Amino acid sequence: MLKGAIAQRYAQALFELAVQENLDGIEAELQELVQCVEQNAEVAHVLYHPHISLSEKKDLMNKIFAGELSVTVRNFLNLLIDRRRQNYLLEIARVFARLADEARNIVEAKVASAIPLSETQEQRLHQELARMTGKNVRMVKEVRPELIGGVMIQIGDRVMDGTVAFKLQRIRQSLSHA
């Protein structure tokens, strides 16, 4: 809980600044920063290593990202380092993306199906989810053969499970209680 609250606070502060400056640009840079940290072990080592001094970390990060990140994002990273909050970077980026989506009236729908959906099925599902939520929908599709058939949709905390696997599970439960 503490990690989420800390990430929320920092993400909210950066978001408010980004709305004033350049929301799309700052969001893209933050994602670029996260991707670099996740994919480059040396960058992650410098950023997270407890025995590298704060000033060394800031100097190295500023050198690495000098031409890549705006002053705003570099200053934000320096703030995280100064406050020893760099371990929250990935969670902050996740919360920031959610805040940016909310500001743009976008909702993410995770759609899992046993086989890939046809283009027609995707379009119908997209339209129905947009109608249900009243928002623009970004679908993240996943194929999971263990679902047997049907579709499972997750939007935020809400899950709609119309899979064959779920229906079979409910039948098993009702038979075992009978």
Swiss-Prot record:
Where, subcellularly, is it found?
Cell membrane
Q: Please give the Pfam families that the UniProt record associates with this protein.
A: OSCP
GO cellular component terms? Answer: plasma membrane; proton-transporting ATP synthase complex
Hey, what's the signal peptide range on this chain? none
Residues annotated as transmembrane: none
Q: Which UniProt keywords apply?
A: ATP synthesis, Cell membrane, CF(1), Hydrogen ion transport, Ion transport, Membrane, Transport
This protein's record includes keyword Transport: yes
Q: How does it sit in the membrane?
A: Peripheral membrane protein
Q: What InterPro entries does the entry give? A: ATP_synth_OSCP/delta_N_sf, ATPase_OSCP/dsu
Q: Which GO terms describe its molecular function?
A: proton-transporting ATP synthase activity, rotational mechanism
Q: Is Hydrolase there in the keyword field?
A: no
Q: How does it assemble?
A: F-type ATPases have 2 components, F(1) - the catalytic core - and F(0) - the membrane proton channel. F(1) has five subunits: alpha(3), beta(3), gamma(1), delta(1), epsilon(1). F(0) has three main subunits: a(1), b(2) and c(10-14). The alpha and beta chains form an alternating ring which encloses part of the gamma chain. F(1) is attached to F(0) by a central stalk formed by the gamma and epsilon chains, while a peripheral stalk is formed by the delta and b chains.
Q: Which family does it belong to?
A: Belongs to the ATPase delta chain family.
Cited PANTHER family: ATP SYNTHASE DELTA CHAIN
Q: What does this protein do?
A: F(1)F(0) ATP synthase produces ATP from ADP in the presence of a proton or sodium gradient. F-type ATPases consist of two structural domains, F(1) containing the extramembraneous catalytic core and F(0) containing the membrane proton channel, linked together by a central stalk and a peripheral stalk. During catalysis, ATP synthesis in the catalytic domain of F(1) is coupled via a rotary mechanism of the central stalk subunits to proton translocation. This protein is part of the stalk that links CF(0) to CF(1). It either transmits conformational changes from CF(0) to CF(1) or is implicated in proton conduction.
Q: Please report the name of this protein according to its UniProt entry.
A: ATP synthase subunit delta
Organism the protein comes from? Desulfitobacterium hafniense (strain DSM 10664 / DCB-2)
